[in-house]
C-alpha cells in the first residue's frame, strides 16, 4: 500500500515488501513483469499518493472476475456519459466499460465528433473516467445524506469499477506509461491496450489495421504494468489483439510474426501478413504473461473461434482470464439464432471469458431513443409523445428502482438544500425543493 512521507519505509524495506507481495500474493500468479522491485522503488518518488478509487475498483473487479460476480462473469456495456453510468449502477450492473469509440464520437475534450481512429485528444478517456467517478461520488453523497448505509436493502454501491480504453497507447511505450498513470489518477480499475500501430489505429471492425511487432505490443503491456506498480495500484490490464482481421504489420524482424509474413509489401512499406485464428493465437499466447485478461477482437460472434482461442491461450497460460467484445458491429441475428444469442454470454463464460461487454451499447441506446422521440415529436401530436414515450414509462420503471422521475433530487438538489440549511444554522427560506413542482406533483 502507498505510504505517506512520514511513515515511509526505507528503500530496502520497500523493495523487500514488493518482492514478497509479487512472490506470495495470488493476485500476481502467472504475471510476468520484466523489471525489478528496485526499478519500481527507484522511479516512484519519496511521496506515494493514494489512489483510492482506482485501488478499490481494481480489487473489486479482480474479485468479480474471479468468482464473486452474480452471473459467474461480469457483463458490462459502454457508458456514453456519467449519468448513464450512474443508471447502470442503479440497475444492478457490476462494472462500467468506457469505450474509446464512444469517446471519439461524442465525449472527447476536443469537443467534436471523430471516428474511432485515435484522432481525439489524449486526455479524453481519463477525463471521462474522472467525470464518471465524480458523478458516482455525488450519487453516493446523496444516498449517504439520506441515512442509507452499506448493508441496507436499498443501499447501492455506486463506485462501479471502470474498465477504460487506452487504444494503442497513443504512441510508444512512454506514451502508454503516462496514459496509464493518468487513467489511474482518474480512478480507472482496468485499462486495455491493443496491438495496432497507433499512428493509423482503426476500430477493430474497420479495414486498414496495421499491427506492431509482437514484442513491441508486449513492451506496451509491460509499460502499463510498470506504471501501475509505480502508482501502487493493482490495476487490471487487458491485452487486446486485432490479429484476426489485421493483415499488415510494420516490421518483419520479430520471430513470433515471421510465420505469418506473405512476402508482400505495401506502398507505405508495411508487410502483409496472413490474418486469422493462428495469428491471433500467437499473439494471445505471447501477451498472456503480461496481462490479467486477454481479448481477441473478432469480426463475427463465433463460439467456435472463441473456444479455439481460449484453449490455445490456456494451454500456454492455464487459468488465464479472457475478455470478449459482444459488439454492435456484429449483425447478431444474421450470425446466430435466438437461442444462441440468449446463451452466448453464458457459453463464453464457460470458456473462461469472465469480462464481457457491449462496447457501443450506450451510444446506440442514446442516439436511437433520441431519434425515436424526436421523430414522433416533430411529426406527431406534440406532448402526447413525451408523455407516452418518456414520462409514463419512467413512472412504471420506479418499481424496478428507477428514480430519475424525481430529476431535481437525482442530481443533488436535496443534498445542496441540506448544505444550505447547515450553513444557515438549521433553517433556510431559499431551499430549492421546498415549493418545487417536483415536491408537489411527483410524490
Mark where each language-model region is:
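Conserved alpha/beta catalytic core and glycan-binding cleft of carbohydrate-active enzymes
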Residues: 339-428
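Alpha/beta enzyme core
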Residues: 21-71, 76-324, 328-330, 334-357, ...
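Alpha/beta catalytic cores of nucleotide-metabolism and tRNA/nucleoside-modifying enzymes
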Residues: 3-7, 20, 178, 350-353, ...
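Charged, low-complexity surface segments at secondary-structure and domain boundaries
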Residues: 1-6, 46-50
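N-terminal charge/polar-biased segments
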Residues: 2-29, 35, 391-443
Amino acid at each position: 500500500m502507498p505510504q505517506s512521507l512520514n511513515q515511509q519505509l526505507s528503500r530496502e524495506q520497500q523493495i523487500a515488501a514488493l518482492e514478497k507481495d509479487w512472490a506470495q500474493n495470488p493476485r500476481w500468479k502467472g504475471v510476468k513483469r520484466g523489471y525489478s522491485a528496485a526499478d519500481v522503488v527507484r522511479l516512484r518518488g519519496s511521496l506515494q499518493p493514494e489512489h483510492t478509487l482506482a485501488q478499490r475498483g481494481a480489487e473489486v473487479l479482480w474479485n468479480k472476475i474471479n468468482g464473486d460476480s452474480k452471473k459467474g462473469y461480469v457483463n458490462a456495456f459502454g457508458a456514453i456519459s456519467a449519468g448513464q453510468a450512474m443508471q447502470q449502477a442503479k440497475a444492478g450492473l457490476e462494472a462500467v466499460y468506457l469505450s474509446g469509440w464512444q469517446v471519439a464520437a461524442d465525449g472527447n475534450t476536443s469537443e467534436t465528433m471523430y471516428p474511432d481512429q485515435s484522432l481525439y485528444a489524449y486526455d479524453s478517456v481519463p477525463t471521462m473516467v474522472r467525470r464518471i467517478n465524480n458523478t458516482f461520488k455525488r450519487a453516493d453523497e446523496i444516498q449517504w445524506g439520506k441515512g442509507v448505509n452499506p448493508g441496507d436493502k436499498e443501499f447501492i454501491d455506486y463506485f462501479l469499477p471502470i474498465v477504460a480504453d487506452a487504444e494503442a497507447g497513443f504512441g510508444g511505450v512512454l506514451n502508454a506509461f503516462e496514459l496509464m498513470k493518468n487513467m489511474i489518477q482518474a480512478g480507472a480499475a482496468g485499462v486495455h491496450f491493443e496491438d495496432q500501430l497507433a499512428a493509423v489505429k482503426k476500430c477493430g471492425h474497420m479495414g486498414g489495421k496495421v499491427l506492431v511487432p509482437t514484442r513491441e505490443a508486449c513492451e506496451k503491456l509491460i509499460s502499463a504494468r510498470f506504471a501501475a506498480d509505480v502508482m501502487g495500484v493493482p490495476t487490471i490490464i487487458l491485452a487486446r489483439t486485432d490479429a484476426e482481421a489485421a493483415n499488415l504489420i510494420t516490421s518483419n524482424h520479430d520471430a513470433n510474426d515471421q510465420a505469418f509474413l506473405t512476402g508482400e509489401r505495401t506502398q507505405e512499406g508495411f508487410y502483409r501478413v496472413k490474418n486469422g485464428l493462428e495469428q491471433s493465437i500467437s499473439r494471445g499466447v505471447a501477451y498472456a504473461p503480461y496481462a490479467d485478461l486477454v481479448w481477441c477482437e473478432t469480426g463475427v460472434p463465433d463460439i467456435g473461434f472463441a473456444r479455439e482461442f481460449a484453449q490455445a491461450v490456456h494451454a500456454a497460460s492455464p487459468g488465464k482470464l479472457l475478455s470478449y467484445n459482444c459488439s454492435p458491429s456484429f449483425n447478431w441475428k444474421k450470425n446466430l439464432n435466438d437461442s444462441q444469442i440468449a446463451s452466448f454470454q453464458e457459453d463464453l463464460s464457460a470458456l473462461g471469458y469472465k469480462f464481457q461487454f457491449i462496447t457501443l451499447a450506450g451510444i446506440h441506446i442514446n442516439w436511437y431513443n433520441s431519434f425515436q422521440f424526436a421523430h414522433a415529436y416533430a411529426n406527431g401530436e406534440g406532448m402526447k409523445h413525451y408523455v407516452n414515450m418518456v414520462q409514463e414509462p419512467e413512472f412504471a420503471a420506479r418499481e424496478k428502482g428507477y428514480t430519475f422521475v424525481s430529476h431535481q433530487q437525482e442530481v443533488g438538489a436535496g443534498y445542496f438544500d441540506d448544505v444550505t440549511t447547515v450553513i444557515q444554522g438549521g433553517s433556510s427560506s431559499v431551499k430549492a425543493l421546498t415549493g418545487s413542482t417536483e415536491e408537489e406533483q411527483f410524490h
